[in-house]
Amino acid sequence: TNIQDKPQIEHRGFYHDVTRGRIPTMDYLKKLVDRMAAYKLNQLQLYMEHTFLFAKFSEVWRDDTPLTPEDILELDAYCRKRHIELIPSIACFGHLYKVLRTRTYCHLCELPDMEQEPFGFVDRMKHHTLDVSNPESMQLAKSLIDEFMPLFTSKYFNICADETFDLGKGKSAGL
């Protein structure tokens, strides 16, 4: 009898959104990585918004207890020891609800004067898209990426440019 225990699929990953509900602890994330290794998964995409301590964006995370750059470096090393690639995944176009509600960045929202609008189930797809007609929007996205990406050893990066439901319905309508 010849038994082979080798995965047939090259990329075997898990996409973990840590922006909904409680922010996971490092202990929880390490246990997740250990379970992934036991099942021979080799990629973990960690999706973050306000759950990361961006130095330039304290208005975004100040009411939370975000993961720090040191946490990410530690988790990346922990993953590597278990043959798992930790892949960064952050919102860079849509899903910027908390960023676009701040005094500093509300002017970059596709829909004007939305910073006080409640974020609820019915309107959850509104008022969180960057205004592509404003060059500052690209600078904001670049700033997020520049701060986050160097913490990971992965050759991949997910910019999450999805769910831009407001695009073309406000300031960029004339483009």
Give the positions of each predicted feature.
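Feature activates predominantly on carbohydrate-active enzymes
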Residues: 1-175
